[in-house]
Amino acid sequence: MDEWKDKVILKEGESLKHDRSFCQGFMQEEDVELYSIVRSDGSVSGAVKVTDHTAVNGFRRTLHVVQTDNEGATVVDKSWRA
């Protein structure tokens, strides 16, 4: 499930730090991963939320990545079928 990393926009010196993962939905059908975007000096410049949803009926998967900056502005918002 690392194909979403190609959709995130990182500046030079920035990297992703995994914060936490959890499942949600009435049948735990959606996996959510939260990341911080960290500069080389250790300060946080944004956040990334990745969701991997498996439809209960049909078992289709939809991936969604949302990247925001420190002000909350959306930098990336993409969804696709896996």
What are these regions (language model features)?
Residues 1-82:
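Eukaryotic scaffold repeat domains enriched in small/polar residues
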